[in-house]
């Protein structure tokens, strides 16, 4: 899918990996739309890169439809959806204070997995209405999972389950949406230098970086964005999950 001139929506696009994706798409000539719960950060970034910012929740159907409808009305229709919105609340199944509250588990699943699916299904409906491009292509969806989907650590039951669900969505979604000319791929990032990690002490950051075989450093969000670019532009990549992690395999703790 050619990025230049395409209308794109990035969820969680106001910071971290989503911000890097939004900047990449804008730099390559896309009409960028950002959907994020942080109004101030979203509007600030939108002003910098010439994007449109929407304040909303990916699990809210009305919020999602509003942003997608605006994005679908630009150019020749919605062509790109990149799902980066997510949360990472930790909690043990059975901790010192008893079992993990079910509401805590449900919240992580709802935001990460249900939110991703909600955006994907609604975006697909709009992409299917767009005119065909060369080869019958109509759109591409890139979802964000995590290496926790494969090596969830202690305290990550909810997070790992949510990201594992996103990994499992890739192939059936790609197969179902193929008849509409819509591709679906997923990136499973390792440890990246996001605002959350940047808030940690330097020695903690270095300790995390030393766990990565090569290169022995934290991932740069721009590298995540470049992987998303590849998945958007390479028309033959479909139904795939790409680990982007410097060959790290997370330990139990």
Cite the ranges covered by each PLM segment:
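Active-site helix of classical SDR
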Residues: 120, 162, 170
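Conserved mid-core segment of classical short-chain dehydrogenase/reductases
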Residues: 88-106, 125, 129-135, 155-158, ...
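Alpha-helical segment proximal to the catalytic Tyr-Lys
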Residues: 125, 174-176
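Short, small/polar-rich loop/turn modules that mediate ligand/substrate recognition or access, typified
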Residues: 178, 183, 238-240
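Canonical Rossmann dinucleotide-binding motif of NAD(H)/NADP(H)-dependent dehydrogenases/reductases
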Residues: 2-33
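C-terminal substrate-recognition "lid" of short-chain dehydrogenase/reductases
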Residues: 2, 220-244, 249
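Residue(s) in the substrate-gating loop at a strand-loop-helix junction
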Residues: 146
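Catalytic Tyr-X3-Lys loop
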Residues: 87, 98-118, 142, 166
């Amino acid at each position: 899918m050619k990025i230049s001139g395409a209308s794109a929506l990035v969820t969680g696009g106001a910071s971290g990996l989503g911000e890097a994706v939004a900047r990449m798409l804008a730099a390559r000539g896309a009409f960028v739309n950002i959907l994020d719960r942080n109004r101030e950060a979203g509007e600030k970034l939108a002003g910098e890169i010439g994007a449109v910012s929407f304040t909303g929740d990916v699990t809210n159907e009305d919020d999602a439809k509003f942003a997608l409808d605006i994005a679908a009305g630009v150019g020749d229709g919605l062509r790109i959806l990149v799902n980066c919105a997510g949360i990472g609340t930790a909690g043990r199944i059975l901790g010192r204070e008893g079992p993990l509250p079910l509401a805590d588990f449900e919240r992580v699943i709802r935001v990460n997995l249900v939110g991703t699916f909600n955006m994907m299904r609604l975006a697909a409906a709009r992409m299917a209405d767009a005119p065909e491009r060369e080869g019958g292509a109509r759109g591409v969806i890139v979802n964000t999972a995590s290496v926790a989907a494969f090596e969830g650590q202690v305290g990550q039951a909810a997070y790992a389950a949510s990201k594992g669900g996103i990994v499992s969505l890739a192939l059936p979604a790609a197969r179902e949406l193929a008849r509409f000319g819509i591709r679906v791929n997923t990136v499973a990032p390792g440890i990246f230098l996001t605002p959350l990690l940047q808030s940690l002490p330097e020695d903690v950051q270095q300790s995390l970086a030393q766990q990565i075989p090569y290169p022995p450093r934290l991932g740069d969000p721009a590298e995540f964005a470049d992987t998303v670019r590849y998945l958007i532009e390479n028309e033959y990549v479909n139904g795939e999950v790409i680990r982007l992690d410097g060959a790290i395999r997370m330990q139990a703790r």
